[in-house]
Design a protein with these regions (language model features):
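Acidic, serine/threonine- and proline-rich low-complexity intrinsically disordered segments
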Residues: 115, 444-450, 454-467, 472-848
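Hydrophobic positions on the alpha1 helix immediately C-terminal to the Walker A/P-loop
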Residues: 129, 133, 471
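Inter-Walker segment of RecA-like/P-loop motor cores
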Residues: 150, 157-215
Length: 848
């Protein structure tokens, strides 16, 4: 099939036509289907046509059934009523006509305090009835009418019947009203607005479900396919105005089940309490519920409708059985589902398939028949189910607690990765490898093999009981090889991966001789993980719409984000998010020892880029979600005052603040300056970025970190924090100044160390201990003193010195000369003695 081209990837090229096989087998079960060849020969698959019998129809003399006659009478009774009469003529069934009358009664009442819910199966005319009711509201003078649905494509029928209603009311296009088409490529030129000018300026405007803030001036709000919109979003759309909502109770548009059991039940209770005089949020409102049972597309009881619903699993919501019990998650086991057996059209396999699709639809996934074919034929997709303890003594299907659909990705050649980077084009499939390749310009990651969890759906009666977590945990352990296979041969895998040569088999037998029937000898539907050898993977990834609850779920299982889309979805208003979890594998060198494995550097780069985008792209993101994504470290060990700053932290004040910023921060923490001194004049954003990069070891509480994120990274004011966190302004500023004091304490310590390191220091004298004993030291000093004394005495008794005192003149002067020389000798002796004494005193000082 041509559609198989979309299912093929570089590493998975063989698609199997299970969907077509099941389709042909289902035709044989439909008694109203006739299969013929190009020569109009009835094929053996439609042999039941031989026993066809006419079906009796109750008709009156005019050829009308009883229901058609009642509709004709209703139209004749209201022919003169405006605007009801002209609009009723456009109705095809009696149920549809009564629904339009109910809508118009509440419109003409103009009390704007009614909520009307329209529930029906597919093909009953819900959207057409809403379109005719909107045309009646315009005729009644309503000016502001808003319409919402999961997508504008869901409103094609509604807007078509608005225009048909205008034609019935004699409105002319381009004269009395204009139709505006969407310029968004994703909306495929769907109608998004109708401007009416006949009476006065009137507008019918499409809004997206999450844009409830635009409903300030609305008079009538119409919600089509409300079951496909998350319940909290639908509740946010309700208000003090007229509300019409419709829901399909089967099919892919939504469950209808969640809506009818929760929202409609709540609206009925509020209507009853208001009637009893109890005040509430929506007190005083009237609620009505309309159900359409008569089909427009098919006759009553047409087997084609039931056959189509069974083939495409459109009655999936009716296939959700009640659980027989809720076992503990630790006692549950994960099983691999063999798709050959699942789509074999056997009775038990069909029941199991219907139950699996019921979980998909009840989990508010956007479903279509294409998804069913993807499950059946895509070569890279695999299915797992979480089951409770199986009682083999009972011959019945076990309860399905959780379903996981996995798509194998990766194993892309490096040449393809380089080609994608050079051309900017990405082939279909392999979402996570190509997105990783684009974000980090990395050509190694696409060559790794991984698995992307496409869908995970839990039974509606078992939500938030731990079954989804158990399924993810078992799936991770399975791909890490913790479930050792019982045998090395994988017979089940060989059966599924063997392609069926359909064309070759068709040439062996003609159509008139071919007998189509379910296969025999198929493998078991459910295979325990120990009985199947897992594919060798390096990571598991997920792509989902970013919400706080979903992100915390995946983060709890150690998945880390690497991509968040900058533009929110036009349908849900959510940003797309991709997360990864590395698996324990010996093929990859892990340089880090943390939980992120080889993804550590990429995760840190993502956090850095995300913190920069918080002031722009993600400025309005909920602070709790931003905190969960950044996941800052808020508790640090207090370093000792004598130790140096730890590695990885800020070591220079210039990296964070200027000297003047530090002075202003000091003034604020000393209560000498106002809060705006910090908010405006200090480079506060840079400081908070260092905190969230774990470069500032400042311990903060969760409230303080959240306030700093809003002010420093998202550039929000205190009023915004008051609304988001529900705190008083004084409480916010109190927490803020506490955090600033902690910042100031650390930064002031850094500044003090910088100043201390810049001051000149005196050189230190190194004193080494002596290596000789005290006795040896004393003996050495004594010998030195004795030598000094001898040298001093030798200098005194020097002959040359004494020669100057010798006799050499007249005798008359002899006595005088002798006296002078005697005195000089005495003086020399005294000086020598003094020097000896001083040496001894010095020696004594050294010894002591």
């Amino acid at each position: 099939m041509d559609v198989h081209e979309r299912y093929r990837t570089e590493s998975h090229t063989e698609a199997t036509g299970r969907f077509n096989e099941r389709f042909l087998l289902s035709i044989a079960s439909c008694k109203a289907c006739v299969a013929m060849d190009d020569e109009f020969n009835i094929l053996p698959i439609s042999s039941h046509i031989k026993s066809i019998t006419p079906v009796p129809v109750k008709e009156d003399s005019e050829g009308l059934s009883e229901a058609e006659k009642d509709l004709k009478d209703l139209k004749e009774q209201l022919i003169d009523d405006f605007p009801v009469g002209p609009l009723i003529k456009k109705c095809c069934t009696l149920d549809q006509g009564k629904a339009v009358i109910t809508f118009l009664d509440s419109i003409l009442d103009k009390t704007l305090r009614s909520t009307i819910a329209l529930l029906a199966a597919r093909g009953r005319g819900k959207s057409a009835a809403l379109g005719l009711a909107i045309a009646g509201a315009i005729a009644a003078g309503y000016s502001n009418i808003f319409v919402t649905a999961p997508s504008p494509e869901n409103l094609r029928t509604l807007f078509d019947f608005v225009c048909k209603g205008f034609e019935a009311l004699d409105y002319k296009e381009h004269i009395d009203f204009d139709v505006v088409k969407s310029t968004n490529i994703e909306f495929k030129k769907a109608t998004v607005r109708i401007n009416i000018y006949k009476q006065h300026r009137q507008t019918i405007q499409y809004i997206q479900p999450h844009e409830h803030e635009k409903l300030s001036q609305v008079e009538l709000l119409v919600i089509d396919e409300a079951a496909a919109i998350p319940l909290p979003v639908v509740k946010s759309l309700l208000g003090p105005y007229l509300v019409f909502l419709s829901s399909t109770v089967n099919g892919y548009e939504g469950t209808g089940r969640s809506l009818s059991l929760k929202l409609i039940q709540q609206l009925e209770q509020q209507s009853q309490t208001s009637a009893q005089g109890v005040e509430g949020a929506l007190s005083g409102r009237l609620f009505k519920k309309i159900e359409l049972s008569e089909s427009i597309r098919y006759a009553s009881g047409d087997p084609i409708e039931s056959w189509l619903h069974g083939l495409l699993c459109l009655d999936a919501t009716n296939s959700v059985p009640k659980l027989s019990g809720l076992p503990h998650p630790s006692k549950c086991e994960l099983y691999y589902v063999n798709r050959d057996t699942l789509f074999s059209f056997h009775k038990e396999s069909e029941l199991f398939l219907q139950r699996m699709m019921a979980l998909y639809v009840s989990s508010h996934y956007k479903n279509s028949p294409n998804d069913l074919q993807l499950m059946a034929d895509a070569p890279a997709h695999h299915l797992f189910v979480l089951l409770g303890p199986v009682d083999e003594s009972k011959n019945q299907l076990p309860d399905i607690l959780c379903v996981i659909q996995v798509c194998l990705e990766g194993q892309i050649s490096r040449a393809s990765a380089l080609r994608s980077l050079s051309t900017g084009r990405q082939p279909a499939g392999d979402q996570i490898p190509w997105k990783f390749n684009e974000q980090f310009q990395d050509t190694v990651f696409p060559t790794l093999s991984g698995a992307r969890i496409v869908r995970i759906a839990t039974h509606p009666s078992a939500i938030k009981l731990g079954y989804g977590s158990q399924a993810v945990e078992l799936l991770t352990r399975y791909y890490e090889g913790q479930f050792a296979p019982i045998s090395e041969t994988d017979s089940e895998n060989a059966v599924e991966n063997t392609p069926v040569r359909v064309i070759e088999a068709a040439k062996q037998v003609s159509l008139l001789e071919e007998n189509i029937k379910p296969k025999k000898g198929l493998p078991h539907l459910l295979v325990h993980l120990r009985e199947r050898k897992p594919e060798k993977l390096h990571y598991i990834g997920v792509s989902f719409g970013l919400t706080l609850e979903l992100f915390r779920f995946w983060r709890k299982h150690k998945f880390v984000p690497f991509f968040i889309g900058h533009s929110p979805s036009t349908v849900t208003g959510e940003h797309s998010c991709m997360v990864l979890k590395p698996l324990n594998n010996d093929d990859i060198e892990d340089k880090g020892s943390d939980e992120f494995g080889f993804l550590g550097p990429f995760y840190q780069d993502f956090r850095l880029r995300f913190s920069r985008l918080l002031s722009q792209t993600f400025r309005s993101m909920e602070y709790k979600l931003a905190m969960s994504i950044l996941e800052p470290k808020m508790k640090f060990m207090e370093p000792d005052s004598g130790t140096s700053t730890l590695d990885g932290f800020v070591t220079s004040i210039k990296e964070v603040l200027s000297p003047y910023d530090l002075k202003r921060l000091d003034a604020y923490t000393s209560n000498l300056a106002d809060y705006h001194m910090i908010d405006v004049n200090v480079q506060f954003g840079r400081t908070v970025k260092h905190l969230y990069q774990e470069k500032l070891p400042v311990s903060l509480s969760a409230a303080q970190a959240s306030i700093l994120l809003c002010i420093g990274l998202q550039n929000q004011d205190v009023s915004y924090i008051e609304r988001e966190m529900g705190l008083e302004r004084q409480q916010i500023l109190s927490q803020f100044i506490k955090a600033m004091k902690k910042f100031h304490k650390y930064l002031d310590r850094i500044a003090s160390k910088e100043i201390e390191s810049s001051l000149p220091r005196l050189s230190e004298i190194a004193i080494e201990p002596t290596k000789v004993s005290m006795e040896q030291d004393l003996e050495k000093a004594a010998r030195q003193a004795e030598a000094d004394m001898k040298s001093d005495l030798k200098g005194v008794m020097d002959p040359e010195l004494l020669e100057q005192y010798a006799n050499g003149g007249k005798k008359s002067s002899k006595s005088k000369t002798d006296n002078d020389s005697g005195r000089k000798r005495e003086n020399a002796m005294e000086m020598a003695e003094e020097r000896v004494v001083s040496k001894l005193i010095h020696l004594k000082g050294i010894i002591t």
